[in-house]
Swiss-Prot record:
CDD domains noted in UniProt: 7tmA_TAAR2_3_4
Source organism (scientific name): Homo sapiens
Places the protein is found: Cell membrane
Disulphide bonds in the chain: C104-C189
Identification of the protein by name: Putative trace amine-associated receptor 3
Transmembrane segments: 36-56, 69-89, 151-168, 173-193, 199-223, 258-278, 288-308
Stretches assigned to the Extracellular side: 1-35, 90-150, 194-198, 279-287
One example GO MF annotation: trace-amine receptor activity
Protein function: Putative olfactory receptor activated by several primary trace amines.
């Protein structure tokens, strides 16, 4: 946002608001008052993540450490779509915040908490996959139910304490008198960070977990290649030839999945955190339209998560068929076999 012409006091508010309104084009253009229900960016995260939540909760065959992490992440993304995004859509459409400063602080705190929680879940899933691929014999002793509970407690509690503590204390806008004038003049409601907290947020909430994920997935990719080379020495005229084909196929799928996970993560989050880091040093000169686009780019990650971690897996596809066909309401459907190839 351009804070160059922020007035020094509230007496110049009308002139300032007219200037901003004349230069700002809303991100969405929706006729009528119903901007909640008909936008794919709001509906799909709700639907996709709800399917993941129902599938893992209902089908006992999906009760595994990895899937419990995915279930928790889907809950995070569902809450983002259900609680946060409707108000964000209204803010983007109307270019204004109508719900007061108190609810603005709750909205921005909860928004940041859920987004950071989603990132922490991605990092936890990477750790889980690391043990599953690199140390398969030790996986069941490392990734126990107790370990998963500790990871989930960390993924939820740390972002909650950080986000609500930062926003409610107004430490993120400390020393930014122009921000307070902007809120008073313009009914402004958006996450804004000063130089110190912008740097802290970039380092601890993006660079550190992102580096961990890149390192872990790089290691997984290398180990998968090593496994494939070992299996390639199995004689073709043995039963191992079939396992060789399946392992190579799984290796290619694993490499593809890893590429998609990291590609989507970096595409959705790198521009956003770069703006958080750089914008304070540019005197907040980034146009509001660009900031709006970055907000929705972050939300887009919640749309991609159920696709990457759920629907690309054949057992979730079968669970989805059970749900849409209504078979999920039949007796003993929770014990349905979603892995027929295993028998």
């Amino acid at each position: 946002m351009d804070l160059t012409y922020i007035p020094e006091d509230l007496s110049s508010c009308p002139k300032f608001v007219n200037k901003i309104l004349s230069s700002h084009q809303p991100l969405f253009s929706c006729p009528g008052d119903n901007v909640f229900g008909y936008d794919w960016s709001h509906d799909y995260p709700l639907f996709g993540n709800l399917v993941i939540m129902v599938s893992i909760s209902h089908f006992k065959q999906l009760h595994s450490p990895t899937n419990f992490l995915i279930l928790s992440m889907a809950t995070t993304d569902f809450l983002l779509g259900f609680v946060i995004m409707p108000y964000s859509i209204m803010r983007s459409v109307e270019s204004c915040w109508y719900f007061g400063d108190g609810f603005c602080k709750f909205h921005t705190s909860f928004d940041m908490m859920l987004r950071l929680t989603s990132i922490f879940h991605l990092c936890s899933i990477a750790i889980d996959r690391f043990y599953a691929v690199c140390y398969p014999l030790h996986y069941t002793t490392k990734m126990t139910n107790s370990t998963i509970k500790q990871l989930l407690a960390f993924c939820w509690s740390v972002p909650a304490l950080f986000s609500f503590g930062l926003v409610l204390s107004e430490a993120d806008v400390s020393g930014m008198q122009s921000y307070k004038i902007l809120v008073a003049c313009f009914n402004f409601c958006a996450l804004t960070f000063n130089k110190f907290w912008g740097t802290i947020l970039f380092t601890t909430c993006f660079f550190t977990p992102g580096s961990i994920m890149v390192g872990i997935y790089g290691k997984i990719f290398i180990v998968s290649k090593q496994h494939a080379r070992v299996i390639s020495h199995v004689p073709e005229n043995t039963k191992g030839a079939v396992k060789k084909h399946l392992s190579k196929k799984k290796d290619r799928k694993a490499a593809k999945t890893l590429g998609i996970v990291m590609g989507v993560f970096l595409a959705c989050w790198l521009p956003c955190f770069l703006a958080v880091l750089i914008d304070p040093y540019l005197d907040y000169s980034t146009p509001i339209l660009i900031l709006d686009l970055l907000v929705w780019l972050r939300y887009f990650n919640s749309t991609c998560n159920p696709l990457i971690h759920g629907f690309f897996n054949p057992w979730f596809q079968k669970a989805f068929k059970y749900i849409v066909s209504g078979k999920i309401f039949s007796s003993h459907s929770e014990t349905a076999n979603l892995f027929p190839e295993a028998h």
